[in-house]
A protein has these predicted regions:
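N-terminal DNA-binding module of tyrosine recombinases/phage integrases
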Residues: 1-44
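N-terminal core-binding DNA-recognition domain of tyrosine recombinases/integrases
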Residues: 26-124
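DNA breakage-rejoining catalytic core of tyrosine-based enzymes
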Residues: 117-144, 188-199, 219
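Basic, Lys/Arg- and aromatic-enriched nucleic-acid-binding interface segment
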Residues: 132-161, 270-276
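A short, glycine-centered helix-capping/turn motif at helix boundaries
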Residues: 153-166, 243, 247-252, 283-286
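Conserved tyrosine-mediated DNA breakage-rejoining catalytic core shared by Y-recombinases
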Residues: 166-203
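Short functional hotspots where side chains directly engage DNA or cofactors
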Residues: 179-184, 258-298
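Active-site/catalytic core of tyrosine-dependent DNA strand-transfer enzymes
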Residues: 197-251
Length: 298
């Protein structure tokens, strides 16, 4: 076995130790809080998407380190070159979010925290996000008619791509107040019933009456990969978030009167914390600032 293959094997062996597929990261963090521990210390890789992403980062790191430092013999030898690798990626223009992901990937492989490498990660600013920026409405994205049904379901449910691909007819139910609810199977093992965007309740009901299903992994699912727009669907989740905020604001029974005041380039804007929490819950998030900075910023 060559040096590169040997070091890669050592790395993958460490990454495999972090696998916690089928477990819930959300529940693990809750358990940590109840035990009086910092939830940020919860370790493990809870999804195959994250695992595969981390593998790609680690393989890239190993390949570049071996090329630049012929003296390394083991994966442990490579660790001191992590700051150099990350700095090189920063110099080449990788975003602060991507650099943080790279750090998390390598931290998982080395069973440490990403800040333990001694690299000074750049600060993440909302204004620097490029995904879906310059798009005023998801109606202008993937305008082809063939995406109309998928876009309607995405804006109705607020699903991430992986969540949408796992939707079944039985994942929808009538709520007591006349709305619809959707069962989302999301990141980190979070599974919950969420509100369907009331703007699309009638249209979604009609769709579900005749919707075709496809056998995937022993389930009858509503969408195949090819039936969802290939471009980012984040802006459709943003549409969902903004519609839900307006819905809860109009309803009047969710607002708490406690105000979230925006900072930075959103200085002067404010949102009710009770409504933010409700929107965050239905997006399968857990932090109000994420909802504001990534979904309600327009």
């Amino acid at each position: 076995m060559g040096k590169k293959s040997n070091i890669t094997h050592q790395c993958l062996k460490e990454l495999n130790k972090q696998k916690k597929f089928g477990e819930s990261k959300f529940e693990a963090k809750q358990a940590a809080r109840k035990a009086g521990r910092n939830s940020a210390t919860v370790r493990g890789i809870y999804s195959t998407v994250t695992f595969n992403s981390y593998v790609r980062v680690c393989k890239q790191f190993i390949a570049e380190t071996i090329t630049n430092h012929k003296n390394v013999k083991t994966f442990a030898d490579c660790k001191k070159y992590v700051p150099e690798f990350l700095q090189d990626k920063e110099d080449k223009g990788l975003s602060a979010w991507t650099l943080a992901q790279y750090g998390s990937a390598l931290a998982s492989a080395y069973d440490c925290q990403k800040n333990d490498f001694g690299y000074d990660y750049p600060v993440r600013h909302r204004a620097n996000i490029k995904r879906c920026r310059g798009v005023n409405s998801s109606d202008y994205r993937s305008p082809e008619e063939r995406w109309d049904t998928a876009k309607m379901v995405l804006k109705a449910t607020g699903c991430r791509r992986t969540e949408a691909l796992r939707l079944r007819k039985e994942d929808f139910r009538e709520a007591t107040n006349g709305n619809l609810e959707v069962f989302k199977r999301g990141k980190g093992g979070i599974e919950r019933w969420c509100l369907v965007n009331p703007k699309y309740t009638g249209e979604l009901r009609e769709y579900l009456k005749t919707a075709e299903t496809h056998p995937v992994s022993g389930e009858n699912r509503l969408f195949l990969k090819a039936q969802l727009p290939q471009s980012s669907i984040h802006d459709m989740r943003a549409d969902y978030a903004r519609d839900l905020y307006q819905y809860f604001e109009d309803r009047g029974d969710v607002a708490t009167g406690k105000i979230y005041h925006c900072k930075g380039d959103m200085l002067g804007r404010s949102f009710d914390k009770g409504i933010l929490s409700a929107v965050s819950y239905n997006l399968q998030h857990s932090r109000d600032n994420v909802v504001v900075n990534h979904y309600l910023w327009k």
